[in-house]
Amino acid sequence: MNHPRSIAMLAALWLVVSVTSTPVRRSPDLEARRRSAIDRSMIRFGRSTLPVVPPAQPSFLQRYSAPQPAALTADDLMTFLRAYEEDYSSPVSKKSASFVRFGRDPSFIRFGRSVDEENSGYQAETNTYPQRRHRARNHFIRLGRDNELSESNDEDRYEVESERTKRSVVDPCNDCA
């Protein structure tokens, strides 16, 4: 009587262990979406992984010569200060100050809205559209509805001046005296 009970317990234990040890399979599209989201965030916040480059083999002289103490010369200091001045001479907006302070690459700041007009927005993939500055227009273009938006803008631009006058300026009745 003890033997069948132990066999049943062993079978149940084997079943639990086999189910818990098998990894959960995600669908391939879900896995691809997760990976691309991780890649996007790594690129956006400046933590993109560098390509793995094997270390160069040191030459014979480097390998067997006496080690030189790493000293900072005056020329090194001047080049460092010039490079630092060039990097930080441009004004940094309040939004990007923390971005740079946290050690991220300043070239990634352009993802948000920019302060200066010449660099604002980004070019479309086809390079046929003008530079876009507004997110709503981006969504219209992605949906293929940019013609509707441009037609409504043309109508607004060429409005009749009489329609633009205030109601309070127009006399309610011309014959009243």
UniProtKB/Swiss-Prot annotation:
Compartment(s) where it occurs, according to its Swiss-Prot or TrEMBL record: Secreted
Entry GO terms, CC: extracellular region
Keywords, ordered alphabetically: Amidation, Cleavage on pair of basic residues, Neuropeptide, Repeat, Secreted, Signal
Phenylalanine amide PTM positions: 45, 102, 111
Tissue specificity of this protein: Only expressed in the CNS and predominantly in the thoracic ganglia. Strongest expression is seen in two pairs of large neurons in each thoracic ganglion. These neurons are ventrolateral neurosecretory cells 1 and 2, they project their axons through transverse nerves into the periphery where axons from the prothoracic ganglion innervate the prothoracic gland.
Pro-piece positions: 22-32, 47-93, 113-131, 145-177
Disulfide topology: none
Leucine amide modified-residue sites: 143
Signal peptide: 1-21
Main location group: secreted
Top-rank taxon, per record: Eukaryota
Biased composition regions of type Acidic residues, renumbered to the chain: 149-158
GO biological process, one term: neuropeptide signaling pathway
Biased composition (Basic and acidic residues): 159-169
Region annotated Disordered, chain positions: 145-177
Functional description taken from the UniProt entry: Regulates ecdysteroidogenesis by direct innervation of the prothoracic gland by reducing cAMP production via the receptor for myosuppressin. The neurons that innervate the prothoracic gland during the fifth instar are most active during days 0-4, after which they reduce and then peak again on day 6. Expression suppresses the biosynthesis of steroid hormones called ecdysteroids that elicit molting and metamorphosis.
Name of the protein in its database record: FMRFamide-related peptides
Taxonomic source organism: Bombyx mori (Silk moth)
